[in-house]
Design a protein with these regions (language model features):
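Hydrolase active-site cap/lid region
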Residues: 191-239
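C-terminal catalytic histidine-bearing segment of alpha/beta-hydrolase fold enzymes
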Residues: 281-333
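Acidic catalytic loop of the alpha/beta-hydrolase fold
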Residues: 270-275, 303
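Short beta-strand element of the alpha/beta-hydrolase
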Residues: 83-87, 92-103
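N-terminal targeting or regulatory segments adjacent to alpha/beta-hydrolase or S9 domains
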Residues: 1-65, 330-333
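Cap/lid segment of the alpha/beta-hydrolase catalytic domain
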Residues: 106-162, 219-226
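Short beta-strand/loop motif that positions the catalytic acidic residue
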Residues: 259-260, 266-268
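Gly/Ser-rich "nucleophile elbow"/oxyanion-hole loop immediately N-terminal to the catalytic nucleophile
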Residues: 143-187
Length: 333
């Protein structure tokens, strides 16, 4: 604990978790007793919903080497969601890359075209890729982060996480995709979503989060470790703090990492004050020895790691996608 004083008067008290021996870092878990049952039931419910993929070629974004499609899929509760699918024209099988979006309605932005990799960029807000169906004025899904937090069953994140698995259903079903070489990545919110998907679905073979949000949601509420995505102001009326934190525990990315089976390469800015780096370190501690490499920029913030560290991250990603080799160059434990 750091205490700042002016004479006898205490100006500020700060307390934080400091990890100095990551390979031996033992951390607690907020995972509820029925966590695995909750998600097994959710995914069983998803299996009852037909995939119903609709693919529309987008001429504007397509090139001589890549066909770009707008994809609409059916998610939990028969609610649709969209994504960009980029299919190279070269003969497969080709590696697959599932890309999770940063926060906000304006993500995922444009498609991620590649001449050598099939990419699927998912939109998780439930609106189409051009936002042409976003109504004027207030709408519940415009504030999807806090929608339905009254209970785990009604939380928007239940639908969102199930949609990730449904997106993987689509990507892994494409005949040109090498089912033995699928990666999932994302930055900020997308980094947290990538960890969640890797925990829920074992069809990917490597996960590459950057500056991930969504680990240790309880800390963001109680201790202000990063300001995204929740504060106590998101607590539904009439709930206690304990009830609110119990709901969040079903969607905390740190509670999924123990189930991740593939290698993980994580880009971290240690001075990240948006999605605090300590939250991610806590989540990564649940990964097994030899399974994780953290690329840590000591002076990097949120999305602002130096080119040196970004290049190390890209090297690992390309090593897996382009050369079908393990992405881990130097394990962190």
């Amino acid at each position: 604990m750091l205490i700042v004083r002016s004479g006898d008067r205490i100006l500020r008290e700060l307390e934080w978790t400091f990890t100095y021996d990551f390979p031996n870092y033992q951390t607690e878990s907020t995972r509820p007793d029925d966590f695995k049952e909750f998600w097994a039931n959710t995914l069983d419910e998803l299996k009852q919903v037909p995939l119903k993929p609709e693919m529309k070629l987008n001429q504007k974004w397509s090139t001589d080497t890549v066909d770009v499609f707008e994809v609409r899929l059916m998610g939990l509760g028969n609610k649709h969601f969209w994504g960009w699918y980029c299919r190279p024209k070269k003969k497969g099988p080709l590696p697959g890359h599932f890309i999770c979006p940063p926060t906000g309605l304006y993500q995922p932005g444009g498609p991620a075209r590649s001449e050598n990799v099939c990419t699927f960029s998912i939109a998780i807000h439930g609106f189409d890729l051009h936002l042409s169906d976003v109504p004027p004025g207030p709408h519940p899904w415009k504030s999807y982060h806090t929608l339905g937090l009254e209970s785990p069953d009604t939380a928007s994140w239940r639908w969102i996480y199930a949609s990730l698995v449904r997106g993987m259903d689509f990507l892994s079903d494409q005949p040109e995709v090498d089912s033995n070489r699928i990666a999932v990545s994302g930055s900020s919110q997308g980094g947290g979503l990538a960890l969640v998907l890797a925990g829920l679905d074992h069809r990917m073979h490597a996960v590459f989060p950057q500056y991930p949000g969504l680990p240790r949601l309880d800390w963001t509420v109680k201790h202000n470790t990063g300001y995204w995505p929740f504060k106590m102001s998101a607590k539904p009326k009439g709930q206690t703090e304990q009830q609110f934190l119990k709901t969040l525990s079903y969607f905390d990315a740190a509670n999924f990492t123990a189930d991740v089976q593939c290698p993980a390469v994580i880009l971290v800015g240690l001075l990240d004050w948006v999605t605090a780096s300590g939250n991610l370190v806590n989540a990564a501690a649940h990964l097994k020895p030899g399974q994780v490499q953290m690329i840590c920029d000591p002076w990097g913030g949120h999305g602002s790691a130096s080119m040196t560290y970004r290049n190390r991250y890209r090297q690992s990603l390309n090593q897996f996608l382009q050369h079908n080799r393990s992405p881990i160059i130097k394990p962190s434990k």
